[in-house]
Amino acid sequence: MTPSRLPWLLSWVSATAWRAARSPLLCHSLRKTSSSQGGKSELVKQSLKKPKLPEGRFDAPEDSHLEKEPLEKFPDDVNPVTKEKGGPRGPEPTRYGDWERKGRCIDF
């Protein structure tokens, strides 16, 4: 086989394969195969739905953004541990270097 005939032979083989692929018998068998898989594709689509999962640690109810109950005031508004009058009612707010109250944070 000469090198000049090789491209012609390759084009002839691909054209013959294309004609065979477009034959009515082959198209009919492809349609029949794809229609028989139609029922299977519906089953696959149904199985892709996620199952119900248990509620996770970070899944919070809708009303979680509401503020929790505020801490009770000290008697006579004086902290019995630090003897501070009118101070914070919870743990020391500056223990991490910033003051946080009702979602507002002020860095010292």
UniProtKB/Swiss-Prot annotation:
GO terms for cellular component: mitochondrial matrix; mitochondrion. Keywords: Chaperone, Mitochondrion, Transit peptide. InterPro entries: SDHF4. GO terms for biological process: cellular respiration; innate immune response; mitochondrial respiratory chain complex II assembly; tricarboxylic acid cycle. It is found in: Mitochondrion matrix. Belongs to the SDHAF4 family. This is Succinate dehydrogenase assembly factor 4, mitochondrial. Residues 1-20 form a transit peptide.
